[in-house]
Regions:
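Central regulatory/effector-binding core of bacterial HTH transcription factors
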Residues: 1-39, 104
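Residues at or immediately flanking beta-strands
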Residues: 3-9, 97-101, 150-152
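Conserved functional loop/turn residues at catalytic and ligand-binding sites
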Residues: 7, 21, 25-26, 45, ...
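Beta-alpha-beta core module
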Residues: 38-49, 62-64, 108-157
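Flexible hinge/capping segments at coil-to-helix
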Residues: 40-79
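Active-site-adjacent beta-strand anchor residues
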Residues: 11-12, 76-77, 103, 121, ...
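Secondary-structure junction motif
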Residues: 73-94, 161-165, 169, 175-187
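Proline-centered flexible-loop/turn and helix-kink motifs
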Residues: 1-4, 96, 143, 184
Length: 190
């Protein structure tokens, strides 16, 4: 209610789609995982989140190794997702094959799939905490190798922000730098 005249529209989509919307001036800004240089888009690193394994059956403990994850049924996003790319890279480096039993983009569908106990998912810590609470499940930090994703604020490179968009950006930056943020939920990117 700090800015009652501003309406925020949230779009959940891949970084590529969001960047395209920025370039075409359909969005003022986007917060995405794992930015890559894109012509026409400026990017500012915000945070880094560790990746966690989330499930409801047979908790592996506070931390889990990729070798153990290779034995589990996985629900992962499609192969263009930053999470999927990071998981595929970790498995490839260890010459392991992931047992992907479903590719799920929707949080509601992923929540139902994890609640069913049929498999586990790899998620950034903030999403893992939320999903874990929703399904009364567990979360384990992926430690060998440790995996994380950086979160970036992307803006159109050649456009000035409207006063409303600038206010939203400033509010976002103040929330990110706030000492009130839950310990270990977010880590500043160095």
């Amino acid at each position: 209610a700090e800015f009652p005249e501003i309406v925020i529209y949230l779009h959940e989509n891949s970084g590529a789609v969001l960047n395209e919307k920025l370039i075409n001036h359909q969005l003022d800004m986007a917060v995405i995982y794992e930015h890559s240089p894109v012509a026409g888009v400026s990017s500012q690193a915000l945070l880094k989140e560790d990746l966690f394994l989330v499930g409801t059956q047979d908790c592996p403990g506070q931390s889990v190794d990729v070798n153990a994850i290779a034995q589990m049924n996985l629900f992962l996003p499609s192969d263009y997702s930053a999470i999927r790319l990071r998981v595929d890279e970790a498995f490839s480096l260890r010459r392991l094959t992931a047992k992907v039993i479903g590719e799920i983009e929707s949080i509601a569908t992923l929540t139902a799939a994890i609640a069913s106990g049929m498999g586990v998912a790899v998620l950034p810590e903030s999403a893992a905490r939320s999903l874990c609470g929703a399904v009364n499940g567990w979360m384990s930090r992926i430690t060998t190798p440790s995996m994380s994703l950086s979160l970036s604020l992307n803006l159109p490179a050649r456009a000035n922000l409207s006063p409303q968009a600038q206010a939203v950006k400033e509010l976002l930056m103040s929330v990110i730098s706030s000492p009130v943020m839950e310990k270990r939920q977010w880590q500043l990117v160095s």
